[in-house]
Curated annotation (Swiss-Prot):
Belongs to the GreA/GreB family. NCBIfam families: greA (TIGR01462), PRK00226.1-2 (NF001261), PRK00226.1-4 (NF001263), PRK00226.1-5 (NF001264). This is Transcription elongation factor GreA. Necessary for efficient RNA polymerase transcription elongation past template-encoded arresting sites. The arresting sites in DNA have the property of trapping a certain fraction of elongating RNA polymerases that pass through, resulting in locked ternary complexes. Cleavage of the nascent transcript by cleavage factors such as GreA or GreB allows the resumption of elongation from the new 3'terminus. GreA releases sequences of 2 to 3 nucleotides. SUPFAM superfamilies: FKBP-like, GreA transcript cleavage protein, N-terminal domain. The gene is greA. Transmembrane segments: none annotated. It comes from the Bacteria. Gene3D superfamilies: Transcription elongation factor, GreA/GreB, C-terminal domain, Transcription elongation factor, GreA/GreB, N-terminal domain. GO terms for biological process: DNA-templated transcription elongation; regulation of DNA-templated transcription elongation. One of its GO terms (molecular function) is RNA polymerase binding.
Length: 157
């Protein structure tokens, strides 16, 4: 069973989603099924079929969350240090073409959110960054073509 690296924040988020799905969403769906069942004939009852589908999707996600939580390897980023980029690092990059600064934290696949500056450890940019240090230049093949960046700061916060 492969371990899934994630930050403490990502782990807490998964546990909260699991709690919500089990303690709030599951009872709501059961109530919807019960309500739809009371309408009679199930063969042509769209509400019933929609509720059963919602139940299936919810239970599938519950199973997925339980698996991820069981395989989680929680990494306390605040206890990491060093000059090289690794999981959990917050990296400040400068685009070599536009001189625009970008800040990314390298996190687990499940907690990635580019809008929040959190990129997946398996993303092309994170893979290019791993093992590099301040002053190094990287090139990332992006959908719009290759982009060059220089690492200006690496921190573990």
């Amino acid at each position: 069973m492969n371990k899934v690296p994630m930050t403490g924040e990502g782990f807490a988020s998964l546990k909260e989603e699991l709690r919500w799905r089990q303690q709030e969403e599951r009872p709501r769906i059961i109530e919807a099924i019960s309500e739809a069942r009371s309408h009679g004939d199930l063969s042509e009852n769209a509400e019933y079929h929609a509720a059963k589908e919602a139940q299936s999707l919810n239970e599938g996600r519950v199973n997925e969350l339980e698996d991820l939580i069981a395989r989680a390897e929680v990494i306390d980023v605040t206890k990491l240090s060093g000059d090289k980029v690794k999981f959990g690092a917050t990296v400040v990059l400068v685009d070599e073409d536009t001189e625009e600064k970008k800040t990314y934290q390298i996190v687990g696949d499940q907690e990635a959110d580019v809008k929040s500056g959190r990129i997946s450890i398996s993303s092309p940019i994170a893979r290019a960054l791993i093992g590099k240090e301040v002053g190094d230049a990287i090139e990332v093949n992006a959908p719009g073509g290759a982009r060059g960046y220089e690492i200006v700061q690496v921190q573990f916060i």
